[in-house]
């Protein structure tokens, strides 16, 4: 067996480091399923980038969204963060689904995201972002490479299962980098 994953920590770190380099100082993280290794790595990248930029990881800027009823939870989470830290100037979304709901929230509340005063960054892309948030930086997943490696690993697994008595090699894990797109420059 084996697996193909993206480098979640490096992608998150690069996005948040970019926001900090652009001068954003109060960068919130909006996440879900914090117990999953993927989300843990994304959170770790966020924290590491803040620390390297000399920024305090303010717990009031941490937004955890429950999956069930996530549309309302995103609104409630953003309401809470903006009430506690009204000068929040950046948002890092750990998934494109959370970012999409946040864009709806910003639109519904008349929060202008087009002028660059709010830094926006997201792990993964949604075609909507180019229209609704063209300045949102994203870590694009290399879908074609992921597919190619997954097929290669699957074919290897099939070959090995058809060779009785053969020595099974150790499972192979492939970690691929994200393609960073800093769109606010």
Describe these PLM feature segments:
Residues 26-27, 57-61, 112-119:
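Short acidic capping loops at alpha-helix termini that bridge into adjacent secondary structure
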Residues 24-26, 89:
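Short acidic/polar active-site loop segments enriched in Thr and Asp
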Residues 3-14, 30-77, 92-101, 122-126, ...:
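Hinge/beta->alpha junction and helix N-cap segments in small-molecule ligand-binding domains
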Residues 79-185:
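Flexible loop/turn connectors
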């Amino acid at each position: 067996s084996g697996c193909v994953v993206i480098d979640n920590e490096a992608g998150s770190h690069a996005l948040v480091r970019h926001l900090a380099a652009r001068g954003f100082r109060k960068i919130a993280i909006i996440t879900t399923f914090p117990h999953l290794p993927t989300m843990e790595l994304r959170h770790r990248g966020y924290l590491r980038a803040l620390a390297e930029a000399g920024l305090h990881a303010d717990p009031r800027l941490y937004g955890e969204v429950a999956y069930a009823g996530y549309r309302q939870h995103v609104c409630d989470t953003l309401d809470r963060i903006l009430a506690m830290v009204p000068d929040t100037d950046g948002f890092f979304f750990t998934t494109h689904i959370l970012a999409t709901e946040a864009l709806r929230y910003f639109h519904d509340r008349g929060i202008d995201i087009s002028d660059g005063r709010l830094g926006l960054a997201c792990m993964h892309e949604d075609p909507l972002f180019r229209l609704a948030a063209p300045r949102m930086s994203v870590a694009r997943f290399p879908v074609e490479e992921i597919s190619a490696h997954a097929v290669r690993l699957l074919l290897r697994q099939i070959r090995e299962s058809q060779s009785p008595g053969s020595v099974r090699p150790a499972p192979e894990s492939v970690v691929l980098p994200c393609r960073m797109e800093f769109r606010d420059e």
